């Protein structure tokens, strides 16, 4: 699918996909393009597109480079999968002959939000670099919202976990905590990747003054968000350690109970074993009150360590 946009009255407007209109486009957004659409761009605009496999490369030389096909940036965008778990999608940006090409394999919130804003938002420079920076700016705003949501969720999780009551809510809090840790790690990767992409863009291109300042402003926003995200990691680790501590305490209580019970019944077991031996010519075997005496000894043998443990404060 090809979403083509041109400039009209300093605003982005969507245009048809026929070849004539594509020549006037400033932004070509390709969402899972078919083979025919790739060939159309190659024949009409002379632009070859990267494969989705190439988008998975993580080394800097494969994500940020410049060649005869233009300036290339591959950047991660935060999204959620069909199960609402945090995920990252890699988007290829190519700028050539004043035209921006974006290649992605799924719909992304940042792109959807920017398209909605572009209906009323005017462009200052009306060029492809401004569209690129606006998309990055929208992405950082989205990441800031994600960080704020994690903060709010961790506040609720703190109350449940630090309460120490291990119930169904405690188990659910642990599951949510692991999800938040995964989300925070993906946000950190996205911030670092965007920082590298913008750094490459600033070094390799001669941006107009306004756009250069916009790029630097985005970089400052990233630098301000990174400490917040790191503090989230620390809080997640603290809550995880606290939860593990409460679990260990509960397990120790259980082991302590079984240990005390085993010690309590060990003397009684010894008495029962001794009483149960059947040897001839032993006067105890013919003692009239031998059975109640043995029962009494067993009870006394069990109560004695119990009372001793209680006085020591071990129970």
Curated annotation (Swiss-Prot):
The keyword Cell cycle does not apply. It is found in: Cell inner membrane. The record marks 252 as: Essential for ion permeation. GO terms for molecular function: cobalt ion transmembrane transporter activity; magnesium ion transmembrane transporter activity; nickel cation transmembrane transporter activity. Keywords: Cell inner membrane, Cell membrane, Ion transport, Magnesium, Membrane, Transmembrane, Transmembrane helix, Transport. A motif (Probable selectivity filter) lies at residues 276-278. GO terms for cellular component: plasma membrane. CDD domains: EcCorA-like_1. NCBIfam families: corA. This is Magnesium transport protein CorA. It comes from Haemophilus influenzae (strain ATCC 51907 / DSM 11121 / KW20 / Rd). The lineage of its organism: Bacteria, Pseudomonadati, Pseudomonadota, Gammaproteobacteria, Pasteurellales.
């Amino acid at each position: 699918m090809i979403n083509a946009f041109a400039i009209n009255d300093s605003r982005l407007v969507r245009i048809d996909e026929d070849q004539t209109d594509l020549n006037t486009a400033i932004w070509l957004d390709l969402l899972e393009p078919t083979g025919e659409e790739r060939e159309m761009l190659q024949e009409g605009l002379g632009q070859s597109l990267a494969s989705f496999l190439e988008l998975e490369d993580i080394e800097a030389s494969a994500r940020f480079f410049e060649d005869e096909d233009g300036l290339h940036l591959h950047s991660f965008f935060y999204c959620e999968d069909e199960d609402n778990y945090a995920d990252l999608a890699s988007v290829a940006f190519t700028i050539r002959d004043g035209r921006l090409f974006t290649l992605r394999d799924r719909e992304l919130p940042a792109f959807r939000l920017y398209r909605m804003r572009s209906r009323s938002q005017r462009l200052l420079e009306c060029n492809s670099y401004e569209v690129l920076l606006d998309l990055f700016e929208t992405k950082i705003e989205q990441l800031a919202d994600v960080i704020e949501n994690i903060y709010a969720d961790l506040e609720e999780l703190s109350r449940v976990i630090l309460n120490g009551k291990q119930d169904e809510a405690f188990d659910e809090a642990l599951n949510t905590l692991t999800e938040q840790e995964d989300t925070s790690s993906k946000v950190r990767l996205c911030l670092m990747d965007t920082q590298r992409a913008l750094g490459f863009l600033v070094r390799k291109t001669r941006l107009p003054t306004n756009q250069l300042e916009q790029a630097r402003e985005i970089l400052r926003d990233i630098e301000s968000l990174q400490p917040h995200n790191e503090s989230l990691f620390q809080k997640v680790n603290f809550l995880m350690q606290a939860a593990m501590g409460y679990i260990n305490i509960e397990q120790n209580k259980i082991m302590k109970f079984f240990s005390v019970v085993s010690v309590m019944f060990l003397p009684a077991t010894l008495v029962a074993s001794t009483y149960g031996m059947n040897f001839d010519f032993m006067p105890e075997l013919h003692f009239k009150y031998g059975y109640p005496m043995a029962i009494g000894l067993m009870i006394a043998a069990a109560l004695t360590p119990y009372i001793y443990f209680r006085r020591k404060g071990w129970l």
